[in-house]
A protein has these predicted regions:
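Glycine/tyrosine- and acidic-biased, solvent-exposed loop/turn segments at the edges of beta-strands
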Residues: 1-96
Length: 96
């Protein structure tokens, strides 16, 4: 499988999404595989996690536009599993 990096931009040209992907065997669609990152319009990291053959897998982190951690949890085969934790933009942890 040959991976390449996709950069999807906001209208401003700044990176909105960056992820690795490969072309499906039938050549008709791209499948995310590996690190996925999303960014807020201000350039701060919005989300980071991994895909395995097109589905979320492993630890994911979401961030507020100010850079504070917003959420943390695990995916297994594209489904949220276990306890997820959440934080307010000021960094205070919310109840789960």
């Amino acid at each position: 499988m040959d991976l390449n990096i996709a950069d999807i931009a906001f209208d401003s040209g700044e990176v909105r999404y960056r992820y690795s992907r490969y072309l499906a065997e039938d050549g008709r669609k791209w499948i995310r595989h590996g690190l996925f990152t999303a960014y807020h319009k201000n350039g701060q990291l919005a989300s980071e996690g991994h895909y395995v053959h097109g589905v979320e897998h492993g630890v994911w982190h979401d961030f507020h536009a100010n850079g504070q951690l917003a959420a943390e949890g695990n995916y297994e085969d594209g489904k949220e599993i276990g306890e997820w934790r959440y934080w307010n933009p000021d960094g205070a942890q919310q109840s789960t």
